[in-house]
């Protein structure tokens, strides 16, 4: 049997990156075509350290904004829908065609130009999930400037850090955000507090006024401007801005990701590689090829997934993107995703596993998907993509069965693995792998609408493997190595690394921090590999299994155990919906695996009162689980991993697992709480990052930890 076309495409991209990426670059419009795709060179840092470096499409000139909007309008697709905004928190829906979107972008870009924004400037976007945020991003890009999106609602100190790091000429913001059922959250005190705390002062703050809560009397003396008034004035005067192309290696955006020192790292996305790689990814991995296709990425523009697959990816290929202001549950219920898919005939849903867990928790019998799917409302849905954290097999299996019943023919769940640094998925299962194969006939058609019929391979969908994040995608050379950088055999867990160069969507540097880039990603393995910070293994067929962050490895009596592996075993218990494993300090073994579990809705522990219907965090549920449940879980762990992984303890509860806005569980917070509790300190400081979704959850976790360890100490005294 011939290899799958995804395997063929990835192998070609690594063996001959020049021909592979030069061909796919022809699918876009270049203001100046690049003479070559890849340039390799040696970079010498101020410290004297030298390392291998690379650049993509260095002498080309391109406009991402033009490729996302103008070229589709010029091709006669101006009446096609570009953006659908659904906001259940405000009861609003809006639709923008490509022609309408272009008009909005041209005028806002003209406004920004009049406000002093020019090529190379940085502009921070601090906004909720509203169309103005996407329009702002594309208007900034149109001027050749660089946008740096920050989650709307971030605390002033966190925003101040990003202001100091990015040194923006302006901040584009809104009068308020709306967090689920909590109502409007005023942005004014957050933005002004951040500017006051920052040593660097942006010259302008441009405010989108929302009806739900106004930013009254903007302070013009300090550069505050009313967004809608500026646009109205510019439109009345016929002010519009033309496209300003940038070099292939110049920035499109900066996205800040957490750093081990606590200071955010600014990942710089470069124009040429970003556009070429993202267009290919959207077409081949997601099978969103162009007009008529609809992508529903339930993410946030403050996260890399939102940048890539709410904003840029769908628009680069001329498809429709759904912009969603709401939550997976509670706005108004766990059926909102399925109803929106039905309403707009979405072909792809992309979200985080935590969203699916939340929907399962609120709808354990799958009543909502049964209702919508039962009337044929999900027949447009070809795939459910999951990313942001590890997708445990149990959640993948549940939704694979549901998609098989209600989705399009062949609908599948696709787990994919990537990062802010990579810009697009590193691994996954292509849904349109043929689109990645280079045409054997020609690669010369400038806008790239030719037929792609290269080397013949197996084009059937790759087999889903629950617990795996799929196979490597073009441009990413995925390896697993030991701590010395030596490659490991298949099935052996180690450090997941990437060979150089990285794919075009990936970063080649941090914004104005060359030394930090080297020390954070290249130094550990002497510049040979890029350290992803994740641990896992490649199986015999090349599928990647990401088990945990490297810093989530637990050393138990000299055995290195991945928390993700243990969590997977725990989640095979039918009564448990979520599990987080950390290391419990132990004087003999160094650490013992220690679990936080969330029982499924309806679970009634032994020796407890019936569940309350009053809400809250289930105060009837003791922090310490029953001996029966603990024994059953430990049996599963020993059977699936071995006795060395036996749990040293377990805390149960609901609403106690802190997560970031992007859905990642904050294991470090739980680990710090436990490490303090072991010392008898239940009120000690814990470093909670600004990305936390709900700070109150940390207090719930602290209370559960205290209850458990005080009970344990009392038992030890008896």
Regions found by a protein language model. Name each.
Residues 65-66, 79, 83-138, 155-160, ...:
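Conserved AMP-binding/adenylate-forming core of the ANL superfamily
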Residues 455-456, 460, 471-475, 486-523, ...:
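Conserved ATP/PPi-binding loop(s) of AMP-dependent carboxylate-activating enzymes
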Residues 138, 142-229, 352-353, 615:
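Structural core segment of the AMP-binding/adenylate-forming
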Residues 319, 347-350, 361-463, 477:
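Gly/Ser/Thr-rich phosphate-binding loop
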Residues 150-175, 342, 349, 446, ...:
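AMP-binding/adenylate-forming catalytic core of the ANL superfamily
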Residues 79-81, 205-213, 218-256, 263, ...:
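Conserved pre-ATP/AMP-binding loop-to-beta segment of ANL
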Residues 204, 554, 580-586, 594-596, ...:
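Conserved C-terminal "lid"/linker of ANL adenylate-forming enzymes
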Residues 273-294, 304-348, 361-362, 367:
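Conserved AMP-binding/adenylation subdomain of ANL enzymes
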């Amino acid at each position: 049997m011939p290899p799958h076309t995804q395997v063929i495409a990835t192998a070609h991209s690594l063996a001959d990156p020049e021909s592979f990426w030069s061909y796919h670059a022809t699918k876009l419009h270049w203001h100046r075509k690049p003479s070559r795709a890849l340039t390799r060179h040696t970079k010498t840092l101020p410290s004297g350290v030298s390392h291998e470096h690379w650049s993509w499409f260095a002498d080309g000139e391109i406009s991402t904004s033009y490729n996302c909007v103008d070229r589709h309008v010029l091709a006669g697709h101006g009446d096609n829908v570009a953006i659908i905004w659904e906001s259940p928190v405000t009861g609003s829906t809006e639709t923008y065609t490509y022609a309408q979107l272009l008009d909005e972008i041209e005028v806002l870009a003209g406004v920004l130009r009049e406000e002093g924004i020019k090529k190379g400037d940085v502009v921070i976007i601090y906004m909720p999930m509203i169309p103005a945020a996407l329009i702002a991003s594309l208007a900034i890009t149109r001027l050749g400037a660089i946008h740096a999106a920050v989650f709307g609602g971030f605390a002033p100190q966190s925003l101040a850090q990003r202001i100091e790091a990015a040194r923006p000429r302006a901040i584009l913001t809104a009068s308020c955000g709306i967090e689920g059922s909590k109502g409007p959250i005023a942005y004014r005190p957050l933005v002004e507090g951040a500017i006051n705390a920052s040593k660097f002062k942006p010259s302008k703050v441009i405010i989108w006024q929302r009806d739900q809560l106004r930013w009254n009397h903007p302070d013009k003396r300090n550069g505050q401007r009313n967004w809608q008034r500026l646009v109205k004035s510019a439109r009345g005067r016929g002010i519009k801005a033309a496209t300003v192309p940038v070099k292939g290696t110049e920035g499109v955006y900066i996205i800040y990701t957490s750093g081990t020192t606590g200071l955010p790292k600014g990942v710089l996305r470069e124009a040429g590689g970003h556009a070429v790689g993202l267009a290919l990814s959207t077409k081949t991995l997601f099978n969103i090829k162009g007009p008529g296709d609809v992508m529903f990425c339930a993410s946030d523009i403050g996260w890399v997934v939102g940048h890539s697959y709410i904003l840029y990816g769908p628009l680069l290929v001329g498809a429709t993107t759904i912009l969603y202001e709401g939550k997976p549950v509670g706005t108004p219920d766990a059926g909102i995703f399925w109803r929106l898919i039905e309403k707009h005939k979405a072909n792809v849903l992309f979200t985080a596993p935590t969203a699916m867990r939340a929907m399962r928790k609120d709808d354990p019998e799958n009543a909502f998907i049964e209702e919508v799917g039962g009337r044929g409302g999900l027949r447009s849905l070809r795939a459910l993509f999951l990313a942001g954290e590890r997708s445990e097999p149990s959640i993948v299996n549940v939704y694979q069965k549901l998609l098989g019943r209600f989705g399009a023919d062949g609908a599948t769940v696709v787990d994919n693995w990537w990062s802010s640094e990579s810009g697009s998925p590193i691994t996954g299962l292509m849904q349109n792998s043929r689109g990645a194969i280079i045409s054997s006939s020609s690669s010369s058609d400038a806008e790239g609408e030719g037929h792609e019929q290269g080397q013949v391979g197996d084009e059937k969908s790759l087999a889903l493997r629950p617990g795996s994040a799929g196979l490597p995608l073009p441009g990413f050379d995925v390896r697993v190595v030991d701590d010395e950088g030596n490659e490991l055999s298949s099935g052996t867990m180690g450090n997941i690394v990437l060979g150089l160069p990285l794919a075009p969507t990936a970063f080649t540097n941090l914004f104005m921090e060359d030394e930090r880039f080297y020390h954070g990603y290249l130094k550990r393995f002497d510049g040979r590999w890029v350290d992803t910070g994740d641990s896992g293994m490649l199986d015999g067929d090349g599928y990647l299994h990401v088990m945990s962050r490297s810093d989530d490895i637990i050393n138990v009596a000299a055995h290195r155990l991945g928390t993700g592996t243990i969590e997977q075993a725990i989640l095979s218990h039918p009564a448990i919906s979520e599990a987080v494993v950390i290391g419990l300090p132990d004087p003999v073994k160094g650490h013992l695996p220690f679990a936080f579990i969330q029982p499924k809705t309806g679970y009634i522990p032994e020796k407890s009162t019936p569940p309350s219907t009053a809400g809250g965090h289930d105060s009837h549920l003791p922090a310490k689980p029953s001996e029966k449940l603990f024994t059953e879980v430990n049996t599963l762990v020993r059977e699936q991993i071995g006795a060395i992984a036996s749990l040293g303890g377990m805390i149960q509860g609901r609403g106690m697992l802190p997560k970031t806005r992007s859905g990642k569980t904050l294991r470090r917070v739980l680990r710090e709480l436990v490490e303090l509790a072991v010392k008898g300190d239940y009120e000690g400081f814990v470093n909670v990052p600004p990305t936390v979704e709900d700070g109150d959850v940390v207090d719930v976790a602290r209370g559960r930890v205290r209850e458990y360890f005080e009970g344990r100490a009392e038992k030890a005294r008896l």
